[in-house]
Regions:
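Conserved glycine-rich beta-strand-loop-beta hairpin in the small C-terminal domain of fold type I
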Residues: 226-229
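Short, well-ordered alpha-helical segments
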Residues: 61-65, 103, 240
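Short, basic/glycine-rich phosphate-binding loops at helix/coil junctions
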Residues: 44-61, 105, 127, 188-194, ...
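Short hydrophobic alpha-helical segments that form membrane-spanning helices or hydrophobic packing faces
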Residues: 105, 231-232
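ATP-binding N-lobe of GHMP and related small-molecule kinases
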Residues: 1-93, 110-120, 145-147, 165
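DPxDG-like acidic metal-binding loop motif
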Residues: 93-124, 135
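Canonical bilayer-spanning transmembrane alpha-helix
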Residues: 222-223
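ATP-dependent small-molecule kinase catalytic core of the GHMP/sugar-kinase superfamily
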Residues: 2-33, 115-219, 232-272
Length: 272
């Protein structure tokens, strides 16, 4: 059988680094929403061997292989699957592409094979894969603390959003290693402060140029550790007009923020 699932991007409406933990991770505070945009994943079972097809990411580096290793260890899951990932979310962009892929496949397999993994267990597996995976399993807009895995649900206005994708790649690991001067500003639903914005603008020229352009038209913010920049609007026409006047080489588009991840509805009727 063949299954098609969404793997949406997330947006960080602010990101405040609180302190470094004893396990070398950082405690953070952030607000998550999802985008009505992202990758598509196609899962085919009844195949002779497992295969991951994703031209943007080398097989051995694909997070899905790590997911399969964890599932084998945790629940002895050994099904052979062919998975094709149609990538739209750039790597190292602050939109959670790999984490979303892993969460979507995990959620789908739990339904397809009736694995009966509780949400608590799914979140535990997600955290083994990475700090951003749990939010895609949770699937609802929220304020997140801890490593980003402790959730307090909130309902936000779903709004048109202009997304700017600089060519710059920013490694989350490197961002935390190199940015030591975390600003103590507060973060809330009206102040989308990001602890990495000043550092990213200083160290990545293209990121700064994109900020300088969009800030002539509207407020703009960094998502996660970057490099994606976003700007929220009250209507599509306004956002689209600004997008249409973007510099010719700037990669940008308009979509909508969502409070609920699409995959939660998609997998309801899956099963074999």
């Amino acid at each position: 059988m063949n299954f098609k699932i969404s793997s949406p991007a997330k947006i960080n409406l602010g990101l405040k680094v609180l302190n470094k933990r004893k396990d070398n991770f950082h405690n953070i505070k952030t607000i998550f929403q999802f985008l009505d945009w992202g990758d598509k994943i196609y899962i085919e079972n009844e195949v002779s061997e497992t295969e991951i097809i994703c031209k943007e990411i080398e097989n051995e580096k694909n997070i899905i292989f790590k997911l399969f290793r964890i599932l084998k260890k945790e629940i002895n899951f050994e099904e052979k699957l062919k998975i094709h990932i149609d990538k739209k979310i750039p790597t190292q962009s602050g939109l959670g592409g790999a984490s979303s892929n892993a969460a979507s496949v995990l959620l789908a397999l739990n339904k397809i094979y009736n694995l009966r993994l509780s949400k608590k267990k799914l979140l535990e597996i997600g955290l083994l894969l990475g700090s951003d995976v749990p939010i895609f399993i949770h699937g609802k807009s929220c304020e997140a603390t801890g490593r980003g895995e402790i959730f307090k649900n909130i309902v936000l206005e779903e709004k048109p959003i202009l997304i700017i994708l600089p060519d710059s790649k920013i490694s989350t690991l490197e961002a935390f290693k190199k940015n030591k001067n975390f600003d103590p500003q507060s973060l809330n639903e009206k102040n989308f402060f990001n602890s990495f914005e000043t550092w990213a603008r200083k160290n990545f020229e293209e990121v700064n140029k994109c900020f300088e352009w969009i800030e002539q038209h509207n407020d703009a913010y960094l998502s996660g550790t970057g490099s994606t920049i976003y700007s929220l609007f009250n209507n599509f026409d306004e956002a689209s007009k600004i997008m249409d006047n973007a510099p010719s080489k700037m990669n940008c588009f308009v979509t909508t923020t969502l409070n609920n991840s699409k995959i939660l509805n998609e997998i309801k009727n899956y099963g074999v």
